[in-house]
Swiss-Prot record:
Function: Responsible for the transport of dicarboxylates such as succinate, fumarate, and malate from the periplasm across the membrane.
Similarity comment: family membership: Belongs to the dicarboxylate/amino acid:cation symporter (DAACS) (TC 2.A.23) family.
Organism field: Escherichia coli (strain K12 / MC4100 / BW2952)
Superkingdom to which the source organism belongs: Bacteria
Stated name of the protein: C4-dicarboxylate transport protein
Pfam families: SDF
Membrane-protein topology: Multi-pass membrane protein
MF term (GO), any: fumarate transmembrane transporter activity
UniProt record, GO biological process: L-aspartate transmembrane transport
Keyword annotations of the record: Cell inner membrane, Cell membrane, Membrane, Symport, Transmembrane, Transmembrane helix, Transport
Length: 428
């Protein structure tokens, strides 16, 4: 029993995170030097994301009997994303108004260091809706894979899958090659995941070593407000959706606990993307659904990021005593409904989208970003964790809506009654 516990990735990552926190706290200079370990692990994962998405989407679409099903799945997924992310924005808005973490700070925007956030504000100017849509279309296929742009790779994979499906039996050889290549890719993922404890240790040691516990205490009310909101969203909103779909959110969280710990250690939900693709398929969701919903969700279904954006924007307004009546808050909500959809595939994405939102709203000081620059890293964990759980739930819900969910397999796996690989007939 003890041997199996020590060998489990869950235990190893959890232990690595704890050691990283202790090292960063007691030996901050050494902790900061551990940054390459975390960065290296995330880069290894990002290296494999593009081929994983390509193989999963192509084999999923090309293996379907009807192309109409793909379009239906995409439409249902986008509808679900819009509804749930809007709920996330509204919940964030309600909680931050009730708690008011920025009230009483009385910060003069003129005293803030605008230079500290200038790089984010400059990048935000390029994050318009048209620019976002145009960015989905790659200048070249090789460029899309080289840059690791998820949506660009997804677009090419969907087109490739459609074209391969139209070839029929003539394309069977290509289909078999891609399917075999997919197995090799997942073999590489299994090797990379053995390094997860090292990556989690390095990332956590760096974070605590560089920013320290004092940063947490300084703006602790905002951090606590954000974490509580994320927990409430997962338990109440996603929990209710899960219950209506026929599964327990807590059992699902237990099922993806290793992925959650990896995300906690690296603060990047992308670090768990390859394993989530595999795990959601083993949970009973059709490969074509998983291949469309998970990658698309990384741009259109970022529930944690949506909560962060509303709370951070209103916090800045409260801290700087900027006017924020009901009209301004509705305006903020409308702007965020659009700007939050561009939060993926951009370095410092949440922060950049927040800068773009403050600029678009107009009456909120962009320099106010300096208030949360130091603690943004500590809130990124909750963002990434909530995003991951949200995309997992979305995959199951969409699979059920389009009747591509194996209910028996879902129930068996979540209740530990069957091996992950066992198959059952689909039910509607």
């Amino acid at each position: 029993m003890k041997t199996s516990l020590f060998k489990s990735l869950y235990f190893q990552v959890l232990t690595a995170i704890a050691i990283g926190i202790l090292l960063g706290h007691f030996y901050p200079e050494i902790g900061e030097q551990m940054k390459p370990l975390g960065d290296g692990f995330v880069k290894l994962i990002k290296m494999i994301i593009a081929p994983v998405i390509f193989c999963t989407v192509v084999t999923g679409i090309a293996g379907m009997e009807s192309m109409k099903a793909v379009g239906r799945t995409g439409a249902v997924a986008l509808l679900y994303f819009e509804i749930v992310s809007t709920i996330a924005l509204i919940i964030g808005l309600i909680i931050v108004n009730v708690v008011q973490p920025g009230a009483g700070m009385n910060v003069d925007p003129a005293t803030l260091d605008a230079k500290a956030v200038a790089v984010y504000a400059d990048q935000a100017k390029d994050q318009g809706i048209v620019a976002f849509i145009m960015d989905v279309i790659p200048a070249s296929v090789i460029g899309a894979f080289a840059s690791g742009n998820i949506l660009q790779v997804l677009l090419f994979a969907v087109l490739f899958g459609f074209a391969l499906h139209r070839l029929g039996s003539k394309g069977q050889l290509i289909f078999n090659v891609i399917e075999s290549f997919s197995q090799v890719i997942f073999g590489i993922i299994n090797m990379i995941m053995r390094l997860a404890p090292i990556g989690a240790f390095g990332a956590m040691a760096f974070t605590i070593g560089k920013y320290g516990v004092g940063t947490l205490v300084q703006l602790g009310q905002l951090i606590i407000c954000f974490y509580i909101t994320c927990i409430l969203f997962v338990v109440l909103v996603l929990g209710s959706i899960a219950k209506a779909t026929g599964f327990s959110i807590f059992k699902f969280i237990r099922y993806i606990r290793e992925e959650l710990l990896i995300v906690l250690g690296t603060s990047s939900s992308e670090s768990a993307l390859p394993r989530m693709l595999d795990k959601m398929e083993k949970l009973g969701c059709r490969k074509s659904v998983v291949g469309l919903v998970i990658p698309t969700g990384y741009s259109f279904n970022l529930d944690g990021t949506s909560i962060y954006l509303t709370i951070a924007a209103v916090f800045i307004a409260q801290a700087t005593n900027s006017q924020m009546d009901i009209v301004h808050q509705i305006t903020l909500l409308i702007v965020l409904l659009l700007s939050s959809k561009g939060a993926a595939g951009v370095t410092g994405s949440g922060f950049i989208v927040l800068a773009a939102t403050l600029s678009a709203v107009g009456h909120l000081p962009v320099a106010g970003l300096a208030l949360i620059l130091g603690i943004d890293r500590f809130m990124s964990e909750a963002r990434a964790l909530t995003n991951l759980v949200g995309n997992g739930v979305a995959t199951i819900v969409v699979a059920k809506w389009v009747k591509e969910l194996d209910h028996k397999k879902l129930d068996d796996v979540l209740n530990n009654r069957a091996p992950d690989g066992k198959t059952h007939e689909l039910s509607s």
